[in-house]
Design a protein with these regions (language model features):
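Extreme N-terminal starter segment of soluble prokaryotic enzymes
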Residues: 1-4
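Hydrophobic anchor at the beta1->P-loop junction of P-loop NTPases
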Residues: 7
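The conserved Walker
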Residues: 11
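Conserved lysine of the Walker
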Residues: 15
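Post-Walker A alpha-helix
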Residues: 18-19
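N-terminal phosphate/diphosphate-binding loop that engages ATP/GTP or pyrophosphate donors
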Residues: 24-75
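Phosphate-binding/switch loop-helix module in NTP-utilizing enzymes
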Residues: 68-118
C-alpha cells in the first residue's frame, strides 16, 4: 500500500492551498472534512472555526452552530469536542480519497473523532491530511503513524 500524505506546517504556509491544488488534479471521489476559521471575530473577539464535508462546494457550506467546532484568538481557545465527535467520524467512512484539512489542537478531547482519524490511517483509502505542528498526544500519533509519510512545508 502507498503511504498516506501528511502535510505539516505552521499556519499560513500553504497546507490547505496545496491540498486544494492536489484535489483539482485528482479524479477520485472525495471524502473527509475541511475546517475553516472565519476571518471576522465574534462579539467576544474570538474567531469561529467550522467543520464541513470536503466534498461540499465552499459556497454550500453552512456556517451555523451545528458545524461550529471551536473558537480561538491568539491566546486561548474554546473547544467543542462533541461537535467533532458528531460530525467527523461519518465523514471519514467513504470516498476514494479522504481529506483531513486540518488536524490540530481543538480536537484534543474528541476521542471518537481521534479514533476515526486513526482508523482511516490504518485503512486502504488514501488520506491527504494537513496537520498543525503542535505537540499533542493525538497529533504525535498521527505524524508517527506507520502508514503515513510526513512532508514539512
Amino acid at each position: 500500500m502507498e503511504k498516506h500524505i501528511l502535510i505539516c506546517g505552521e499556519r499560513g504556509v500553504g497546507k490547505s492551498t496545496l491540498i486544494r491544488r492536489l484535489l483539482a488534479e485528482s479524479t477520485l471521489p472525495v471524502g473527509g472534512f475541511v475546517t475553516r476559521r472565519l476571518t471576522q471575530a465574534d462579539g467576544d473577539g474570538m474567531f469561529p472555526i467550522y467543520l464541513h464535508a470536503a466534498a461540499l462546494p465552499p459556497e454550500e457550506r453552512p456556517y451555523d452552530p451545528e458545524h461550529l467546532v471551536g473558537t480561538c484568538d491568539s491566546r486561548r481557545s474554546i473547544r467543542y469536542p462533541e461537535a467533532f465527535d458528531r460530525l467527523g467520524p461519518p465523514l471519514l467512512t467513504s470516498g476514494g480519497l479522504l481529506v483531513m484539512d486540518e488536524l490540530g489542537f481543538l480536537e484534543n478531547d474528541a476521542h471518537l473523532f481521534q479514533a476515526a482519524v486513526l482508523a482511516a490511517l490504518d485503512g486502504p483509502v488514501p488520506v491527504l491530511a494537513a496537520i498543525k505542528p503542535k505537540e499533542t498526544d493525538f497529533l504525535r500519533r498521527v505524524r508517527q503513524h506507520p502508514c503515513g509519510e510526513v512532508f514539512y512545508i
